[in-house]
């Protein structure tokens, strides 16, 4: 869901008929067609969802990021991420006591969540960080899932075009 652009910017993509029905979540700027004490009428999408001054710097950064990934080719990025994910899964499965959560073959994502018996996920994250390997640890904004798994958290490795096997 990320395309290597700046933080704090995104795209709302949807069918026009649904966007027309969707209320704006903020107010201000050029999104207002007419306002009175009785009623506010909003512009049509996309203006309807653009409150305040747009972040022109982030918009430009997103455009450059999209040009970059387009030039590389999404198929090439996908193939690279899949190769890294496959390699990492092979390596992880060699670890005694490993528990890999929810990763089915050929699912298409480049994310692996795991734990190792008797080692706290944060400890694994700290050790990997000392080796120059960046991972996330914790509940990953999914506490109900983590509770269902019966664990305190997981280690999550995700792969992108900037990662290598090394």
Question: How should these model regions be labeled?
Answer:
Residues 1-166:
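Pyridoxal 5′-phosphate
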């Amino acid at each position: 869901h990320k395309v290597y652009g700046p933080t704090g910017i995104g795209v709302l993509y949807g069918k026009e008929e649904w966007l027309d029905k969707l209320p704006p979540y903020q107010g201000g700027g050029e999104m207002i067609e007419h306002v009175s004490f009785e009623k506010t009428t909003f512009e049509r999408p996309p203006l309807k969802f653009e409150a305040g001054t747009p972040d022109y710097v982030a918009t430009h950064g997103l455009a450059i990021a999209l040009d970059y990934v387009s030039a590389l080719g999404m198929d090439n990025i996908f193939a690279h991420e899949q190769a890294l994910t496959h390699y990492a899964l092979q390596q992880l499965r060699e670890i005694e006591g490993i528990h890999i959560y929810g990763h089915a073959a050929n699912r298409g994502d480049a994310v692996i969540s795991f734990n190792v018996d008797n080692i706290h996920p944060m400890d694994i994250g700290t050790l990997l960080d000392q080796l120059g390997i960046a991972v996330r640890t914790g509940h990953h904004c999914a506490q109900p899932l983590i509770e269902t798994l019966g664990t305190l958290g997981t280690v999550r490795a995700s792969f992108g075009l900037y990662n290598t096997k090394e």
